[in-house]
Amino acid sequence: MEPGKPDFNFLPFKIHNNVVYLAGQLAKENGLVKNLGRVTEQISVLEAERQIKICAQHAFSWLEIAAKANKCHIDSILDLRVYVSCNKEFDGISILADKASEFFIKKLGDNGSHPRSVLAVSRLPQNAPVMIDLRASLKLKWGNINGKFY
């Protein structure tokens, strides 16, 4: 799945000291978030779970792009933040966040395990129901670069 590109003048990710800082990822399909609104109001929990998995897929795709461009591989997920647009009565935000956590653990094994924050908000960009952002570490691939072995 190709990750959604930023709609405005910001970077999808930035690397500093082998850490990838990833911009917030929405569940865009063909450039658009298809189902908009708040979880349990306009969006079912099942649809929110589907969208959170898409967010995680986009995030992982950007991490792969960042790693490849820097001749590295993804080392580990350092932290994950999950945002859920919902009303104050909805108490299932952690269950939704579990879907993103499970995705990264499935992809990276123990290196996909991470600390996590989950936040309920009244509205997200483009009226999306869910969004994630994260930080991940990159590791140089083993090899000989400029006469040095890594």
Residue positions per predicted region:
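N-terminal presequence-like segments and the immediate start of the first folded domain
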Residues: 1-57, 61-78, 89-150
